[in-house]
Amino acid sequence: ATSKTDTSLKAIHMTPSVPGGTLREAERENYRFFLRLPEFDRTRLKVGTVKGSQFLLPLFEYSGACAGCGETPYVKLLSQMFGDRAVIANATGCSSIYGGNLPTTPWARNAAGQGPAWSNSLFEDAAEFGLGFRLSIDQQNEFAKGLLTQLTDVLSDHSTVGTTVGAILDADQSNEAGIIAQRERVSWLTDNLRRMNTPESLHLLSVVDALIKRSVWIIGGDGWAYDIGYGGLDH
């Protein structure tokens, strides 16, 4: 407070930064300009290096973690490298407080609407929780491949070079370029399934995204790692 006698002044006294809010509006426009900047081509970046990875778009931003938190830089890096296809099994603790402080969340999405899928387990069983994610995703992938194989003859009439059923089933998704190529093939498949509008095509349409490789991660805070649960024995 600037006065010990004026009781209207508190320890923190809020006043407008600039009358009329002109400064805030100018900064909002600067931020909108920043968001419109194009992203780097992920296939041309050396994401295996620290320098190269930092050119990737973070899909974890503005979290409510404590200042100096040692975990969030790693979570941000994870979101840069795998965020557009990440599935995260979170353990209750710090990572659930800064990661799911609803109605806000630091987990973001890119211009295509892709971003991490995040869920939290209350029971400190993140290992089992994450394993369940992995098993269910693998099962959905096999199920989608089986349905796709049944529709091979129908889809062959719509195939072009690089978008055949065989290319989808045998896709190499071991690197960024392969995953992007698979996304394009699955997009082609999705369009054709919608046009077909048969029970079989609609069934496959419900799980078609499982044909794109997912990256499953288990995240926990310090409480999960050291304090909570059965003395860490279940971890």
Where are these regions (language model features)?
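Gly-rich Lys/Arg/Thr-decorated short loops/hinges at beta-loop-alpha junctions or inter-strand turns
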Residues: 50-61, 183-189, 212
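Generic, well-ordered alpha-helical scaffold segments in large soluble proteins
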Residues: 1-6, 72, 77, 81-85, ...
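Short secondary-structure boundary/capping segments
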Residues: 19-21, 30-33, 102-111, 232-235
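N-terminal leader/propeptide and maturation segments of large enzyme subunits in energy/redox metabolism
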Residues: 122-197
